[in-house]
Amino acid sequence: EKQVRIWRRSYDIPPPMLNPGDPRSPVFEKKYRNIDPKILPMGESLEMTCQRVLPFWNDAIAPLILEGKNVLVAAHGNSLRALVKYLKQIPDSEIPNLEIPTGMPQIFEMRQDLSVARDFYLS
């Protein structure tokens, strides 16, 4: 249980990677059938998740915000942790303490330079 928490909450400690033939591998999930199996993660740390999430932030989400649009992001918990870490500039050493409640929208008000002016949960 302690080791699982370390894998789930640390920034740069990944869990053991799945073998490609493992039945839990994402290559066997229908929703990924149109994605090159070589790019599907077999497990990842939050650091690795950031490497996947931040290009999407920069290429898809940030431009919409700069156009003045409101953007709703619904994602897996670790993807949200990666995005919140980036937006709030949370140091790696503090990331194990970041709690993101399930099903509770978090609002980010952004400045023109895309820094966070304020954030809060709708409750």
What feature does the model see in each segment?
Residues 31-33, 73, 99:
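Short alpha-helical linear motifs
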